[in-house]
């Protein structure tokens, strides 16, 4: 059992489906909340940017951890929001089916053990030439109090 085993089973299930290569696959962990309009924002990013991976979670660790002190991001504007390149996210992310198929072995490799090593997985994917973008401000958040995506009153929004 465990989170990594569940995510591995999900990855294997999805990869066996007969989706179109351009279909958007969105993986969502069970401890995330989303702002209204998140579907439109995700589609906007996919349709206007063309990155490999997308996250609606503006992870707060990028703002305070010493390891990100010198982090440089490319800022991209779409019709209604800004996006930035980011080196990692959690297992709540989107990609096109063709991207998942291309990198499935990497996803599965980082699911070995009790927990998915999501940070290491995305930094490894980055090293392999893929990219990840995050909308700013975030349209989703981890619901742990110290992991909330900044600039949104999530407590008010989730009541």
Ranges and model annotations:
Residues 20-22, 50-51, 129-130:
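Short, high-confidence coil segments that cap the C-terminus of an alpha-helix
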Residues 33-107:
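Conserved catalytic core of nucleotide-sugar-dependent glycosyltransferases
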Residues 28, 56-57, 138:
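Conserved residues at the C-terminal ends of beta-strands
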